[in-house]
């Protein structure tokens, strides 16, 4: 029996649309080759039928693999829930609640995303005051790139540092030498030349988030603990715990001394960890502090270094706002103290995190730094940095920018002045509204005191109810202190550098209006109480 591929193709195609019981008589009577006996015809039809069935099966498998959730008939995607029941379980990391996305810190962001303020399109929307982003000096960066287009561009022919080929191919995972050298110089410059940094001890990461997590992986094992003074950056719950399995033990500080950490508080946290079987592996501080907007005093830094040495643990100093200190006292970097203490053996315990997200206002570039005086830590960090690389083009552009001494110096001075002016503007506006703030000298935020407004008997519950009112009524996303693990309820972090001055003034007006409403309600309640008496 001889059958052409043409015939099989026709029969296969027809079988896709016509049920086989109706199809086979039609094939036999009308479209079988001539001079075939009955057996040949039966074989012929069987081949065509099974070819069609096989085609159907293979097509179904192909559709399932390449268009898993697509409804072919309707051209629509089926809901993910339709497939979830048959899927095997995910890992403990994937399903862990340690990410902290249920925190008010992240919930406020979601509320903003659903109803973002826009001066024209949505003037009654939520104003984002929960994002520590520096946009006050973006014009300086844009002007530099406009005047130096070669920094961000490349040539399309040949090879060399400025060529497309050189940027596109694999680079040293440790980072471009030119960029590490420029970064080391910039880190020293923003500290007033009081500390020096070795480019060979710099390990690049995709932002400070990756740098902090990388150090946690290196210094601690799952089940160990990091000691962190409160209040602290809400993202640490995600960055340090979620994937590492490491615990955070809060070092409780309070407003009596401006939330400055004390040796007694450090020891209490260390003992608390030991009491539940957790081994403390490091103290992590932010200097300048997020969310306080303050710097750590030299005496306290010395005390912390003595504490980690005495207890044989490490110190991580997150200094991503080190170039954003705009008022006295000046920043004292732990790098200064390491150099001053010389050969007392402390250097191997000290690790610094830095980033260009805050001081340079470039969070989208994802550039972070692990700087360690410990060679073993540097080696381990380099090995792990392959999971969190910075693109060659980003490094090339920033190497040119930071190597320009005149530009870098002018940027630092202008940015500090603008941040100081913004800070003073916000503090004055809040004071007019009757809201005091902790005295700050750094960062992109103020630490606002609304303890007297606490609802429902105070405490964290009262703070969250107040936060909800600020979010839903005043349409302001402001981070509550409880999301920063503050030991006192009623404090809020207010960011001021991520918006225009007009938007900031509107936000201050909304706070003032909110306070007027609260004062009126309080006065009315007081009058009613007097009448009852």
Swiss-Prot record:
Induction cue: Induced by submergence.
Tissues expressing the protein: Expressed in shoots and leaf blades. Expressed at low levels in leaf sheaths. Expressed in vasculature of roots and shoots.
Gene Ontology terms: biological process: amino acid metabolic process; ethylene biosynthetic process
Catalytic activity entry: S-adenosyl-L-methionine = 1-aminocyclopropane-1-carboxylate + S-methyl-5'-thioadenosine + H(+)
Keyword Lyase listed: yes
EC assignment: 4.4.1.14
Cofactor: pyridoxal 5'-phosphate
Lyase listed as a keyword: yes
A GO term, aspect molecular function: lyase activity
Alphabetical UniProt keywords: Ethylene biosynthesis, Lyase, Pyridoxal phosphate, S-adenosyl-L-methionine
Organism superkingdom: Eukaryota
Recorded metabolic or biological pathway in which this protein acts: Alkene biosynthesis; ethylene biosynthesis via S-adenosyl-L-methionine; ethylene from S-adenosyl-L-methionine: step 1/2
UniProt cross-references to Pfam families, sorted A to Z: Aminotran_1_2 (PF00155)
InterPro entries reported for this sequence: Aminotransferase_I/II_large, Ethylene_sulfur-biosynth, NHTrfase_class1_PyrdxlP-BS, PyrdxlP-dep_Trfase, PyrdxlP-dep_Trfase_major, PyrdxlP-dep_Trfase_small
Positions where N6-(pyridoxal phosphate)lysine occurs in the chain: 358
Function in brief: Catalyzes the formation of 1-aminocyclopropane-1-carboxylate, a direct precursor of ethylene in higher plants.
Entry-linked PANTHER family: AMINOTRANSFERASE CLASS I_CLASSII DOMAIN-CONTAINING PROTEIN (PTHR43795:SF39), BIFUNCTIONAL ASPARTATE AMINOTRANSFERASE AND GLUTAMATE/ASPARTATE-PREPHENATE AMINOTRANSFERASE-RELATED (PTHR43795)
Similarity field: Belongs to the class-I pyridoxal-phosphate-dependent aminotransferase family.
The protein's name in its UniProt record: 1-aminocyclopropane-1-carboxylate synthase 5
Organism encoding this protein: Oryza sativa subsp. japonica (Rice)
